[in-house]
């Protein structure tokens, strides 16, 4: 797991004492931020899901949202169906995935840590697109996991070209993360 060393914690405390705003910025949802980080007395805000949401850590209230419109998300999911990749998406601070993908999570991910992460943080549904249509709301992030790294690079370029309103990033070896172009940890800091 990710741990903040005593030295770094001391540096953060000092920076906070000097009047700087210290906000964890992560691809995770608020509840997945390590307790150690949330326990720092100077952490008042958190930038989560790659900047899709900025929250007040005391109240949990959302201060800023940058989400993918539902129709864009559904077009994206249709588009990425051409790749040999599993996909999931964050809606309402939870990662949702087709049950069939979760059952084959090892086919797409050779890294045991990633397999465990996906199994513990994704909620399975029978049909993700139908689930999202039924909810009728924008989504926070779409994630893809690829078996083949060359295909991942092709997909990165093709998605960026076909969806200018989407920001394509990645956080581990075989994934791509798709956020609204205005969801960006840097922009979120300006809020």
Residue ranges and their predicted role:
Residues 2-20, 65-72, 124-129, 151, ...:
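Short, acidic loop-to-helix structural element flanking the phosphoryl-transfer center
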Residues 79, 83-86, 90-191:
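Conserved acidic, metal-coordinating active-site core of Asp-based
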Residues 8-112:
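Active-site phosphate-binding/coordination module
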């Amino acid at each position: 797991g990710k741990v903040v060393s005593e030295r770094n914690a001391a540096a953060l405390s000092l920076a906070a004492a000097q009047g700087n705003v210290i906000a964890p910025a992560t691809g995770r949802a608020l509840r997945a931020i390590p307790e150690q980080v949330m326990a720092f007395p100077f952490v008042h805000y958190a930038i989560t899901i790659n900047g899709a949401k900025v929250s007040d850590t005391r109240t949990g209230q959302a201060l800023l949202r940058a989400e993918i419109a539902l129709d864009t998300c559904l077009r994206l999911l249709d588009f990425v169906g051409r790749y040999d990749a599993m996909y999931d998406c964050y809606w309402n601070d939870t990662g949702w995935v087709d049950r069939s993908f979760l059952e084959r999570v090892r086919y797409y991910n050779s890294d045991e840590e990633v397999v465990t992460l996906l199994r513990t943080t994704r909620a399975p549904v029978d049909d993700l697109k139908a689930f999202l249509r039924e909810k009728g709301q924008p989504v926070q992030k779409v994630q893809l996991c690829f078996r083949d790294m060359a295909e991942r690079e092709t997909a990165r370029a093709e998605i960026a070209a076909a969806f200018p309103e989407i920001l394509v990033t990645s956080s581990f070896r075989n994934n791509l993360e798709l956020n609204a172009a205005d969801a960006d940890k840097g922009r979120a800091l300006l809020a």
